[in-house]
């Protein structure tokens, strides 16, 4: 009888956990003033990000991290108690609201970049007449920093970062800096040293992704740096290892983030509501390994996630909406997002449930029951 009760309890736990993992849902996991850019540490289960917030006292630290298995118990001045702030760089932001970009490798790279180390843009305004823009390097928990890992010659902080995890650009960190009507694309080795890949007139990008080198799945996008431009053009573009740019036509929407769908859990930084939101979107299971884009603007039919793909028949890049945030009761006006594998303790709970069931069956066999 005891074994039967154990089995029933384990079965109920397994069913409840599976239902949670497979259901569509949205939940606020943290409160952060003015979150702008986020990234995700795959081995630590942390969302790491930057903010733009008008309260100048908040800039004693520039970045923050959230353990996604935690939930806020208290919120003070827009900041929940499960947020770890770090950085403490000589930064002071005024004017503009573009925020500081952050990124991290999802795995150890052959070039020497290590998983979960943090690379973040910031502006040193200690000399207000001569601001300087840098990429800072942080160890995974943010307690150690190399503030001047790389210093840009131009102080513009309209910069996007992305790691080449495919090898097209030597498994290096890529930076795309926009200055007066011109974009400069660079690759950085582990010391921060930069090599220019190309410069492009009248181009400004909102997102970067080095597409896996699988021509069957990605067609002419395979192995290329895929980006979306902003402003009047809003085009899909690719750049190859030699810096040659190809324009694939108009998107007509603002794609803030490009990603490969590796799971069905999304972390969304929603700037207007000062929140980090966890979305569970089972529809993404149908697009594992595909390119997806996070669309944020006020144009109909609304913000959401698009599937971006190479159409072999027309030899062109196409996209279709596969999820609308309104279906989750959300209406983000300015945000970025990351999509990740199942990160929470629910996955461990599911595995534990399965192991408990197997242990029960083994004990039953041993006892002849």
Where do the model's predicted regions map?
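Bacterial N-terminal signal peptides that target proteins for export
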Residues: 1-8
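Basic polycationic patches enriched in arginine
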Residues: 5, 362-363
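Bacterial N-terminal signal peptides
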Residues: 10-18
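Intrinsically disordered, low-complexity serine/threonine-rich segments
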Residues: 17, 26-28, 347-348
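Bacterial Sec-dependent signal peptides at the C-terminal "C-region" and cleavage site
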Residues: 19-24, 360
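Sequence/structural signature of beta-propeller domains
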Residues: 24-339
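A short, hydrophobic C-terminal helix/tail in secreted or cell-surface proteins
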Residues: 342-360
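Short, charged juxtamembrane terminal tails flanking transmembrane helices
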Residues: 364-369
